[in-house]
Amino acid sequence: GGTLFGIGMTIAGGCANKNLIRLGAGSLRSLVVLVFLGISAYMTLKGLFGQWRAGFLDPIAVDLSRWNLPNQGLPGLLSRATGLSEKTALLGTSLALGLGLMAFVFKDGRFRRNVQQVLGGVALGLLVVAAWYLTGHIGHGENPDTLETVYFATSSRTLESLSFVAPTAYSLELMMLWTDQTLRVTFGIATAAGVALGSLVYALATQKFRWEGFASVEDLRTQLFGAVLMGFGGVTSIGCTIGQGMSGVSTLGIGSFLALAGIVAGAVGTMKWQQR
């Protein structure tokens, strides 16, 4: 899933989040990409692609209990391998990855000197944490109708953070079935709409709003193919560059690192092929 998403976002000119930003800035091309991405994602969640996904892909899984691992977190794996306590393993893993990533990004002098990018990265990280807190703490409570403990306003019925593939699909569903009283504006839908709206406000404030379309029929064909790959791959990998690359990795889950590796491999491989 990650590999297909990486291929798709490269040939479509950007991931779901980037296309939402471009949509707010006036890109009709991104509007078409998002519509096809949403349709593909919805087909993978509940439609034609979903039947194949549920029948052939979902049953394939690694049974972590065979190694007495309680979950797929890296700290648990480190604790099991070294005998360290879970708290020590969590602290060590967090420090190693955090410091390693900081060393990697700050070795680039251009990035260090770009205060706007540094502050933007910090803000994105804080938003991921805030989203976990919002959906997992504030949005978690007792349903007054059933008296069961539930997560409110999330499509997955569990806590969520920033992600944009499935929310794009659910946004299309909500707009098409607006009168269905069982549907509601979830955290993911609100986040996707907020990104596009924020981009629109920024583009208008800085006078960068420009209408943009497709350059040619070939450009249209390529973008649509990439959008379909992103929709299928994003659902299959349970996240996109933001959903797995930031939100997922913040949980230190092995699956998120695998998905991120697939996204990077797919993107790099596609760019190499384009530049051949």
What is the predicted function of each stretch?
Residues G1-R276:
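Membrane-interfacial helix-loop segments of redox and metal-homeostasis proteins
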